[in-house]
Protein backbone atom coordinates (compact mmCIF):
# COMPACT_ATOMS: atom_id res chain seq x y z
CA UNK A 1 0.00 0.00 0.00
CA UNK A 2 1.27 3.47 -0.90
CA UNK A 3 0.25 6.58 1.03
CA UNK A 4 0.51 10.08 -0.38
CA UNK A 5 2.45 12.74 1.48
CA UNK A 6 -0.80 14.15 2.89
CA UNK A 7 -0.57 15.50 6.43
CA UNK A 8 -3.38 16.62 8.75
CA UNK A 9 -3.50 20.37 9.26
CA UNK A 10 -2.84 21.60 12.78
CA UNK A 11 -4.30 24.98 11.82
CA UNK A 12 -7.70 23.50 11.01
CA UNK A 13 -10.66 23.64 13.39
CA UNK A 14 -11.34 19.98 12.55
CA UNK A 15 -9.73 17.64 15.12
CA UNK A 16 -6.72 15.70 13.86
CA UNK A 17 -8.38 12.31 14.26
CA UNK A 18 -11.37 13.50 12.21
CA UNK A 19 -9.07 14.70 9.42
CA UNK A 20 -7.31 11.32 9.36
CA UNK A 21 -10.65 9.50 9.45
CA UNK A 22 -11.90 11.47 6.43
CA UNK A 23 -8.65 10.96 4.51
CA UNK A 24 -8.81 7.20 5.02
CA UNK A 25 -12.54 7.09 4.27
CA UNK A 26 -11.95 8.89 0.95
CA UNK A 27 -9.32 6.30 0.03
CA UNK A 28 -11.81 3.51 0.71
CA UNK A 29 -14.90 5.06 -0.88
CA UNK A 30 -13.05 6.08 -4.04
CA UNK A 31 -11.76 2.55 -4.52
CA UNK A 32 -8.07 3.33 -3.96
CA UNK A 33 -8.08 1.02 -0.94
CA UNK A 34 -10.01 -1.98 -2.21
CA UNK A 35 -11.76 -4.54 -0.02
CA UNK A 36 -9.11 -6.82 1.47
CA UNK A 37 -6.43 -4.13 1.57
CA UNK A 38 -4.36 -4.31 4.75
CA UNK A 39 -3.69 -0.83 6.10
CA UNK A 40 -0.35 0.07 7.76
CA UNK A 41 0.04 -0.47 11.49
CA UNK A 42 -1.09 2.25 13.89
CA UNK A 43 2.51 3.02 14.77
CA UNK A 44 3.45 3.39 11.10
CA UNK A 45 0.45 5.66 10.44
CA UNK A 46 1.29 7.75 13.49
CA UNK A 47 4.84 8.20 12.18
CA UNK A 48 3.60 9.09 8.71
CA UNK A 49 1.01 11.59 9.93
CA UNK A 50 3.29 12.85 12.73
CA UNK A 51 0.63 12.45 15.40
CA UNK A 52 0.20 10.44 18.59
CA UNK A 53 -0.79 6.81 18.19
CA UNK A 54 -3.99 7.49 20.14
CA UNK A 55 -5.05 9.94 17.41
CA UNK A 56 -4.73 7.23 14.77
CA UNK A 57 -6.52 4.74 17.02
CA UNK A 58 -9.49 7.09 17.34
CA UNK A 59 -9.76 7.45 13.55
CA UNK A 60 -9.54 3.69 12.98
CA UNK A 61 -12.10 2.98 15.71
CA UNK A 62 -14.57 5.32 14.01
CA UNK A 63 -14.07 3.69 10.60
CA UNK A 64 -14.46 0.29 12.23
CA UNK A 65 -17.76 1.34 13.80
CA UNK A 66 -18.92 2.45 10.34
CA UNK A 67 -18.21 -1.03 8.98
CA UNK A 68 -15.39 0.07 6.66
CA UNK A 69 -12.48 -1.48 8.57
CA UNK A 70 -12.07 -4.62 10.60
CA UNK A 71 -9.21 -5.54 12.93
CA UNK A 72 -8.21 -9.13 13.55
CA UNK A 73 -5.82 -10.35 16.20
CA UNK A 74 -2.53 -11.17 14.53
CA UNK A 75 -3.88 -10.18 11.12
CA UNK A 76 -3.80 -6.40 11.27
CA UNK A 77 -6.59 -4.11 10.11
CA UNK A 78 -8.18 -4.56 6.69
CA UNK A 79 -10.75 -2.81 4.51
CA UNK A 80 -13.93 -4.91 4.65
CA UNK A 81 -16.49 -2.62 3.07
CA UNK A 82 -16.87 0.18 0.53
CA UNK A 83 -19.55 2.25 -1.14
CA UNK A 84 -20.20 -0.45 -3.71
CA UNK A 85 -20.58 -3.25 -1.20
CA UNK A 86 -23.08 -1.17 0.74
CA UNK A 87 -25.17 -0.38 -2.35
CA UNK A 88 -25.16 -3.83 -3.94
CA UNK A 89 -26.05 -7.29 -2.75
CA UNK A 90 -23.07 -8.87 -4.49
CA UNK A 91 -19.82 -9.03 -2.49
CA UNK A 92 -17.10 -6.75 -3.92
CA UNK A 93 -14.01 -8.07 -5.65
CA UNK A 94 -11.29 -8.87 -3.12
CA UNK A 95 -8.05 -7.84 -4.84
CA UNK A 96 -5.93 -9.01 -1.90
CA UNK A 97 -6.04 -12.60 -3.18
CA UNK A 98 -4.55 -11.46 -6.48
CA UNK A 99 -1.94 -9.31 -4.76
CA UNK A 100 -0.76 -12.26 -2.67
CA UNK A 101 -0.63 -14.50 -5.76
CA UNK A 102 1.82 -12.36 -7.75
CA UNK A 103 5.16 -14.03 -8.46
CA UNK A 104 7.29 -10.98 -7.64
CA UNK A 105 8.06 -10.73 -3.94
CA UNK A 106 7.18 -7.60 -2.01
CA UNK A 107 9.84 -5.40 -0.46
CA UNK A 108 10.39 -5.69 3.27
CA UNK A 109 8.32 -3.30 5.38
CA UNK A 110 11.38 -1.18 6.15
CA UNK A 111 12.32 -0.82 2.47
CA UNK A 112 8.72 0.11 1.66
CA UNK A 113 8.83 2.73 4.42
CA UNK A 114 12.09 4.09 2.98
CA UNK A 115 10.58 4.36 -0.51
CA UNK A 116 7.43 6.04 0.82
CA UNK A 117 9.25 8.59 2.96
CA UNK A 118 12.13 9.57 0.68
CA UNK A 119 10.00 12.06 -1.32
CA UNK A 120 9.16 14.02 1.85
CA UNK A 121 10.71 17.49 1.79
CA UNK A 122 11.16 17.49 5.58
CA UNK A 123 13.22 14.29 5.70
CA UNK A 124 17.00 14.07 6.11
CA UNK A 125 18.02 11.25 3.77
CA UNK A 126 21.09 9.51 5.21
CA UNK A 127 20.62 6.32 3.21
CA UNK A 128 19.77 7.56 -0.27
CA UNK A 129 21.94 6.09 -3.04
CA UNK A 130 21.79 8.97 -5.49
CA UNK A 131 23.42 12.31 -6.12
CA UNK A 132 22.05 15.39 -4.42
CA UNK A 133 20.09 17.67 -6.78
CA UNK A 134 22.98 20.10 -6.25
CA UNK A 135 25.34 17.60 -7.90
CA UNK A 136 23.15 16.68 -10.87
CA UNK A 137 24.24 18.63 -14.00
CA UNK A 138 20.71 19.80 -14.80
CA UNK A 139 21.81 23.09 -16.42
CA UNK A 140 24.23 21.41 -18.83
CA UNK A 141 21.71 18.73 -19.78
CA UNK A 142 19.07 21.44 -20.25
CA UNK A 143 21.33 23.36 -22.64
CA UNK A 144 21.98 20.15 -24.58
CA UNK A 145 18.26 19.69 -25.17
CA UNK A 146 17.89 23.33 -26.20
CA UNK A 147 20.54 22.79 -28.88
CA UNK A 148 18.97 19.65 -30.34
CA UNK A 149 19.26 19.32 -34.10
CA UNK A 150 15.92 17.77 -35.13
CA UNK A 151 17.67 16.05 -38.00
CA UNK A 152 19.70 13.78 -35.71
CA UNK A 153 17.02 13.05 -33.14
CA UNK A 154 14.87 9.95 -33.52
CA UNK A 155 11.58 9.77 -31.64
CA UNK A 156 10.70 6.31 -32.89
CA UNK A 157 11.69 2.91 -31.51
CA UNK A 158 15.42 2.29 -31.36
CA UNK A 159 17.32 -0.82 -32.44
CA UNK A 160 16.89 -3.84 -30.14
CA UNK A 161 20.36 -3.33 -28.63
CA UNK A 162 19.85 0.40 -28.29
CA UNK A 163 20.89 3.59 -30.09
CA UNK A 164 23.92 2.89 -32.29
CA UNK A 165 25.57 6.25 -31.52
CA UNK A 166 25.27 5.61 -27.79
CA UNK A 167 26.67 2.08 -28.04
CA UNK A 168 29.64 3.44 -29.99
CA UNK A 169 30.16 6.13 -27.35
CA UNK A 170 29.97 3.54 -24.55
CA UNK A 171 32.49 1.32 -26.39
CA UNK A 172 34.90 4.30 -26.63
CA UNK A 173 34.32 5.11 -22.95
CA UNK A 174 35.11 1.54 -21.93
CA UNK A 175 38.43 1.63 -23.80
CA UNK A 176 39.58 4.08 -21.14
CA UNK A 177 39.07 1.25 -18.64
CA UNK A 178 40.99 -1.19 -20.89
CA UNK A 179 37.75 -2.94 -21.77
CA UNK A 180 37.63 -3.63 -25.50
CA UNK A 181 34.18 -4.53 -26.78
CA UNK A 182 32.41 -3.70 -30.02
CA UNK A 183 29.12 -1.77 -30.10
CA UNK A 184 27.41 -5.00 -31.17
CA UNK A 185 28.39 -6.54 -27.80
CA UNK A 186 26.67 -3.79 -25.81
CA UNK A 187 23.01 -3.61 -24.75
CA UNK A 188 21.51 -0.31 -23.60
CA UNK A 189 19.21 -0.81 -20.61
CA UNK A 190 16.99 1.38 -18.43
CA UNK A 191 19.44 1.32 -15.54
CA UNK A 192 21.59 -1.55 -14.27
CA UNK A 193 18.64 -2.99 -12.34
CA UNK A 194 16.87 -3.79 -15.60
CA UNK A 195 19.97 -5.65 -16.77
CA UNK A 196 19.76 -7.85 -13.66
CA UNK A 197 16.08 -8.51 -14.33
CA UNK A 198 16.83 -9.51 -17.92
CA UNK A 199 19.63 -11.82 -16.80
CA UNK A 200 17.39 -13.45 -14.19
CA UNK A 201 14.69 -14.38 -16.69
CA UNK A 202 16.82 -14.77 -19.82
CA UNK A 203 19.90 -16.74 -18.80
CA UNK A 204 19.23 -18.66 -15.59
CA UNK A 205 17.07 -21.59 -14.54
CA UNK A 206 14.77 -21.72 -11.54
CA UNK A 207 16.52 -22.95 -8.38
CA UNK A 208 19.82 -21.46 -9.53
CA UNK A 209 22.12 -20.24 -6.74
CA UNK A 210 23.63 -16.77 -7.10
CA UNK A 211 26.83 -16.14 -5.14
CA UNK A 212 27.40 -12.60 -3.91
CA UNK A 213 29.22 -10.64 -1.24
CA UNK A 214 27.83 -10.41 2.28
CA UNK A 215 26.42 -7.85 2.87
CA UNK A 216 25.17 -7.04 -0.62
CA UNK A 217 22.94 -4.55 -2.40
CA UNK A 218 21.44 -7.55 -4.17
CA UNK A 219 19.89 -8.70 -0.87
CA UNK A 220 17.77 -5.53 -0.77
CA UNK A 221 16.11 -6.53 -4.06
CA UNK A 222 14.05 -9.54 -5.06
CA UNK A 223 15.10 -9.72 -8.70
CA UNK A 224 16.57 -13.21 -8.61
CA UNK A 225 14.45 -14.57 -5.76
CA UNK A 226 11.23 -13.65 -7.60
CA UNK A 227 12.49 -15.70 -10.55
CA UNK A 228 12.80 -18.74 -8.28
CA UNK A 229 16.51 -18.40 -7.41
CA UNK A 230 18.47 -18.23 -4.18
CA UNK A 231 21.25 -15.92 -3.02
CA UNK A 232 24.28 -17.20 -1.14
CA UNK A 233 26.23 -14.49 0.68
CA UNK A 234 30.00 -14.78 1.12
CA UNK A 235 31.84 -12.75 3.78
CA UNK A 236 34.45 -10.21 2.70
CA UNK A 237 37.69 -8.91 4.15
CA UNK A 238 39.43 -5.61 3.38
CA UNK A 239 40.30 -6.87 -0.11
CA UNK A 240 36.83 -8.07 -1.06
CA UNK A 241 35.42 -11.57 -1.44
CA UNK A 242 37.92 -14.46 -1.36
CA UNK A 243 38.31 -16.66 -4.44
CA UNK A 244 38.62 -19.74 -2.23
CA UNK A 245 35.24 -19.06 -0.64
CA UNK A 246 33.68 -18.56 -4.06
CA UNK A 247 35.06 -21.90 -5.24
CA UNK A 248 34.05 -23.89 -2.14
CA UNK A 249 30.53 -22.44 -2.06
CA UNK A 250 30.16 -23.02 -5.78
CA UNK A 251 30.95 -26.69 -5.25
CA UNK A 252 28.89 -27.10 -2.07
CA UNK A 253 25.79 -25.15 -3.10
CA UNK A 254 25.95 -25.36 -6.88
CA UNK A 255 26.47 -21.63 -7.42
CA UNK A 256 25.68 -20.74 -11.03
CA UNK A 257 27.43 -17.39 -11.10
CA UNK A 258 29.00 -14.65 -8.97
CA UNK A 259 27.53 -11.15 -8.67
CA UNK A 260 30.07 -8.64 -7.41
CA UNK A 261 30.60 -4.89 -7.00
CA UNK A 262 34.43 -4.81 -6.88
CA UNK A 263 34.86 -1.02 -6.87
CA UNK A 264 33.33 0.96 -3.98
CA UNK A 265 31.05 -1.86 -3.01
CA UNK A 266 27.44 -1.19 -2.09
CA UNK A 267 26.88 -1.05 0.87
CA UNK A 268 30.36 -1.28 2.47
CA UNK A 269 32.49 0.91 0.17
CA UNK A 270 35.13 -1.86 -0.07
CA UNK A 271 37.49 -1.91 -3.06
CA UNK A 272 38.59 -5.36 -4.24
CA UNK A 273 42.39 -5.46 -4.47
CA UNK A 274 44.17 -6.06 -7.77
CA UNK A 275 45.52 -9.40 -6.54
CA UNK A 276 42.08 -10.53 -5.45
CA UNK A 277 40.67 -9.56 -8.85
CA UNK A 278 43.30 -11.67 -10.58
CA UNK A 279 42.39 -14.61 -8.34
CA UNK A 280 38.69 -14.23 -9.14
CA UNK A 281 39.43 -14.05 -12.88
CA UNK A 282 41.66 -17.13 -12.63
CA UNK A 283 38.88 -19.00 -10.82
CA UNK A 284 36.33 -17.93 -13.43
CA UNK A 285 38.57 -19.22 -16.20
CA UNK A 286 39.39 -22.49 -14.42
CA UNK A 287 35.82 -23.35 -13.44
CA UNK A 288 34.05 -21.68 -16.37
CA UNK A 289 32.09 -19.57 -13.91
CA UNK A 290 30.12 -16.57 -15.23
CA UNK A 291 30.47 -13.31 -13.31
CA UNK A 292 28.22 -10.25 -13.23
CA UNK A 293 30.45 -7.24 -12.55
CA UNK A 294 28.46 -4.20 -11.39
CA UNK A 295 30.66 -1.13 -11.89
CA UNK A 296 28.09 1.56 -11.09
CA UNK A 297 30.51 3.41 -8.77
CA UNK A 298 33.84 2.72 -10.49
CA UNK A 299 34.24 6.26 -11.86
CA UNK A 300 33.64 7.90 -8.47
CA UNK A 301 37.17 7.54 -7.04
CA UNK A 302 38.70 10.30 -4.91
CA UNK A 303 42.44 9.94 -4.30
CA UNK A 304 43.31 7.29 -6.88
CA UNK A 305 41.64 5.04 -9.42
CA UNK A 306 40.61 1.57 -8.31
CA UNK A 307 42.29 -1.43 -10.00
CA UNK A 308 41.09 -2.11 -13.52
CA UNK A 309 37.70 -3.82 -13.83
CA UNK A 310 37.43 -7.60 -13.94
CA UNK A 311 36.12 -7.24 -17.48
CA UNK A 312 39.44 -5.71 -18.56
CA UNK A 313 41.18 -8.97 -17.55
CA UNK A 314 38.52 -11.23 -19.10
CA UNK A 315 39.82 -12.96 -22.23
CA UNK A 316 37.31 -15.82 -22.23
CA UNK A 317 34.06 -13.83 -22.33
CA UNK A 318 33.01 -14.94 -18.83
CA UNK A 319 32.16 -11.48 -17.48
CA UNK A 320 28.91 -9.58 -17.95
CA UNK A 321 29.81 -5.95 -17.22
CA UNK A 322 27.23 -3.45 -15.96
CA UNK A 323 27.61 0.33 -16.07
CA UNK A 324 25.15 3.20 -15.72
CA UNK A 325 24.66 6.95 -15.46
CA UNK A 326 22.38 6.59 -12.43
CA UNK A 327 25.14 7.19 -9.87
CA UNK A 328 27.47 9.47 -11.80
CA UNK A 329 25.10 11.78 -13.70
CA UNK A 330 21.40 11.39 -12.90
CA UNK A 331 19.07 8.50 -12.00
CA UNK A 332 16.34 10.25 -13.97
CA UNK A 333 18.01 9.51 -17.32
CA UNK A 334 17.44 5.76 -16.69
CA UNK A 335 20.37 4.77 -18.89
CA UNK A 336 22.76 1.91 -18.30
CA UNK A 337 24.62 -0.66 -20.36
CA UNK A 338 25.53 -4.31 -20.33
CA UNK A 339 28.65 -5.57 -22.14
CA UNK A 340 29.14 -9.26 -22.80
CA UNK A 341 29.37 -11.99 -25.45
CA UNK A 342 27.25 -11.19 -28.50
CA UNK A 343 24.98 -14.27 -28.20
CA UNK A 344 24.11 -13.19 -24.65
CA UNK A 345 23.50 -9.58 -25.70
CA UNK A 346 21.26 -10.69 -28.58
CA UNK A 347 19.26 -12.98 -26.27
CA UNK A 348 18.72 -10.23 -23.69
CA UNK A 349 17.99 -7.63 -26.38
CA UNK A 350 15.20 -9.87 -27.67
CA UNK A 351 13.71 -10.14 -24.17
CA UNK A 352 14.02 -6.40 -23.63
CA UNK A 353 12.09 -5.73 -26.83
CA UNK A 354 9.32 -7.96 -25.49
CA UNK A 355 9.15 -6.03 -22.22
CA UNK A 356 9.50 -2.34 -23.13
CA UNK A 357 10.51 -1.95 -26.82
CA UNK A 358 13.66 -0.16 -25.76
CA UNK A 359 14.83 2.56 -23.40
CA UNK A 360 13.82 6.19 -23.90
CA UNK A 361 15.11 7.53 -27.22
CA UNK A 362 15.54 11.01 -25.75
CA UNK A 363 17.57 9.70 -22.83
CA UNK A 364 19.73 7.61 -25.16
CA UNK A 365 20.42 10.66 -27.32
CA UNK A 366 21.33 12.74 -24.26
CA UNK A 367 23.65 10.01 -22.94
CA UNK A 368 25.37 9.70 -26.32
CA UNK A 369 25.97 13.45 -26.44
CA UNK A 370 27.14 13.46 -22.83
CA UNK A 371 29.81 10.85 -23.55
CA UNK A 372 30.90 11.85 -27.05
CA UNK A 373 31.16 15.62 -26.43
CA UNK A 374 33.38 15.31 -23.34
CA UNK A 375 30.76 16.47 -20.84
CA UNK A 376 31.06 13.27 -18.83
CA UNK A 377 34.75 13.52 -17.92
CA UNK A 378 34.39 17.22 -17.14
CA UNK A 379 31.45 16.51 -14.85
CA UNK A 380 33.25 13.61 -13.13
CA UNK A 381 36.19 15.82 -12.17
CA UNK A 382 33.82 18.22 -10.43
CA UNK A 383 31.51 15.65 -8.82
CA UNK A 384 34.43 13.64 -7.41
CA UNK A 385 35.69 16.75 -5.64
CA UNK A 386 32.25 17.52 -4.22
CA UNK A 387 31.68 13.94 -3.06
CA UNK A 388 35.09 13.89 -1.37
CA UNK A 389 34.14 17.05 0.54
CA UNK A 390 30.93 15.37 1.68
CA UNK A 391 32.75 12.18 2.64
CA UNK A 392 35.27 14.13 4.72
CA UNK A 393 32.45 16.00 6.45
CA UNK A 394 30.55 12.78 7.18
CA UNK A 395 33.67 11.18 8.70
CA UNK A 396 34.23 14.30 10.82
CA UNK A 397 30.65 14.18 12.14
CA UNK A 398 30.93 10.45 12.83
CA UNK A 399 34.10 11.01 14.84
CA UNK A 400 32.42 13.82 16.79
CA UNK A 401 29.12 12.10 17.59
CA UNK A 402 29.71 8.34 17.27
CA UNK A 403 33.41 7.78 17.79
CA UNK A 404 32.85 5.99 21.10
CA UNK A 405 30.01 3.70 19.98
CA UNK A 406 30.81 2.66 16.39
CA UNK A 407 33.55 1.80 13.91
CA UNK A 408 33.86 2.37 10.17
CA UNK A 409 36.35 2.41 7.30
CA UNK A 410 36.88 5.58 5.30
CA UNK A 411 35.87 4.84 1.68
CA UNK A 412 38.16 5.86 -1.18
CA UNK A 413 35.21 6.62 -3.44
CA UNK A 414 31.55 5.93 -4.12
CA UNK A 415 28.65 7.00 -1.90
CA UNK A 416 28.73 4.95 1.29
CA UNK A 417 30.25 4.49 4.74
CA UNK A 418 29.41 1.20 6.47
CA UNK A 419 28.95 2.14 10.13
CA UNK A 420 28.97 -0.70 12.67
CA UNK A 421 27.85 -0.04 16.24
CA UNK A 422 29.54 -1.84 19.13
CA UNK A 423 26.30 -3.52 20.22
CA UNK A 424 23.23 -4.92 18.46
CA UNK A 425 20.20 -2.66 18.03
CA UNK A 426 16.48 -3.42 17.74
CA UNK A 427 16.44 -2.70 14.01
CA UNK A 428 12.79 -1.75 13.54
CA UNK A 429 12.68 0.42 16.66
CA UNK A 430 15.91 2.19 15.70
CA UNK A 431 14.58 2.88 12.20
CA UNK A 432 11.17 4.20 13.25
CA UNK A 433 12.47 6.27 16.15
CA UNK A 434 14.82 8.04 13.75
CA UNK A 435 11.95 8.47 11.30
CA UNK A 436 10.03 10.29 14.03
CA UNK A 437 13.01 12.63 14.19
CA UNK A 438 12.70 13.09 10.42
CA UNK A 439 15.89 11.15 9.69
CA UNK A 440 15.82 8.26 7.22
CA UNK A 441 18.52 5.57 7.42
CA UNK A 442 19.19 2.29 5.65
CA UNK A 443 19.75 -0.40 8.31
CA UNK A 444 22.37 -3.04 7.52
CA UNK A 445 19.62 -5.63 7.97
CA UNK A 446 18.28 -4.99 4.47
CA UNK A 447 21.65 -5.96 2.94
CA UNK A 448 22.33 -8.87 5.29
CA UNK A 449 19.42 -10.49 7.08
CA UNK A 450 21.66 -11.40 10.03
CA UNK A 451 22.98 -7.87 10.62
CA UNK A 452 21.67 -6.06 13.70
CA UNK A 453 24.27 -3.36 14.34
CA UNK A 454 25.14 -1.57 11.09
CA UNK A 455 23.80 1.15 8.84
CA UNK A 456 24.68 2.21 5.32
CA UNK A 457 25.47 5.90 5.63
CA UNK A 458 25.28 7.81 2.34
CA UNK A 459 27.00 11.18 2.02
CA UNK A 460 25.93 11.73 -1.60
CA UNK A 461 22.49 13.27 -1.05
CA UNK A 462 22.09 15.20 2.21
CA UNK A 463 23.53 18.70 2.57
CA UNK A 464 26.46 19.19 4.96
CA UNK A 465 24.11 20.69 7.54
CA UNK A 466 21.69 17.80 7.22
CA UNK A 467 24.55 15.31 7.42
CA UNK A 468 25.56 16.69 10.80
CA UNK A 469 21.98 16.84 12.10
CA UNK A 470 21.20 13.33 10.87
CA UNK A 471 24.41 11.70 12.10
CA UNK A 472 24.00 13.33 15.51
CA UNK A 473 20.40 12.05 15.74
CA UNK A 474 21.42 8.54 14.65
CA UNK A 475 24.24 8.43 17.21
CA UNK A 476 22.00 9.69 20.02
CA UNK A 477 19.29 7.17 19.19
CA UNK A 478 21.75 4.28 18.89
CA UNK A 479 23.48 5.20 22.16
CA UNK A 480 20.17 5.30 24.04
CA UNK A 481 18.98 1.97 22.61
CA UNK A 482 22.29 0.26 23.34
CA UNK A 483 22.05 1.36 26.98
CA UNK A 484 18.43 0.27 27.45
From Swiss-Prot:
GO terms for biological process: alpha-amino acid metabolic process; biosynthetic process. It comes from Bacillus subtilis (strain 168). Residues 14-82 form the HTH gntR-type domain. The modification N6-(pyridoxal phosphate)lysine is found at residue 327. It comes from the Bacteria. Residues 42-61 bind DNA. GO terms for molecular function: DNA binding; DNA-binding transcription factor activity; pyridoxal phosphate binding; transaminase activity. Coiled coil: none annotated. InterPro entries: Aminotransferase_I/II_large, HTH_trans_reg/aminotransferase, PyrdxlP-dep_Trfase, PyrdxlP-dep_Trfase_major, PyrdxlP-dep_Trfase_small, Tscrpt_reg_HTH_GntR, WH-like_DNA-bd_sf, WH_DNA-bd_sf. In the C-terminal section; belongs to the class-I pyridoxal-phosphate-dependent aminotransferase family. Pfam families: Aminotran_1_2, GntR. SUPFAM superfamilies: PLP-dependent transferases (SSF53383), Winged helix' DNA-binding domain (SSF46785). Keywords: Aminotransferase, DNA-binding, Pyridoxal phosphate, Transcription, Transcription regulation, Transferase. Its cofactor is pyridoxal 5'-phosphate. This is Uncharacterized HTH-type transcriptional regulator YisV.
Amino acid sequence: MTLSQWQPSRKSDVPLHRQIEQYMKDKILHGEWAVGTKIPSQRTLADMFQVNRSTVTAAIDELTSQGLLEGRKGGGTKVVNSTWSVLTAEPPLDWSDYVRSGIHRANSSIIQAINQNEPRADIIRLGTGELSPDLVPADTIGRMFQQINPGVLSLGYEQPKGNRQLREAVADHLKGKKIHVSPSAILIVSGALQALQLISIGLLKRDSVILTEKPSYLQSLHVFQSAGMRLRGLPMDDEGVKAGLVSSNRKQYGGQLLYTIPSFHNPTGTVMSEQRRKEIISLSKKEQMPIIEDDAYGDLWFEEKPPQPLKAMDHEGNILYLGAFSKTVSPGLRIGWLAGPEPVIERLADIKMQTDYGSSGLSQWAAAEWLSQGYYEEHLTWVRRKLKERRDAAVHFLERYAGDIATWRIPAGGFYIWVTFHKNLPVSRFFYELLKRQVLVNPGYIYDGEDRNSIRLSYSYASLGDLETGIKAAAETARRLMMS
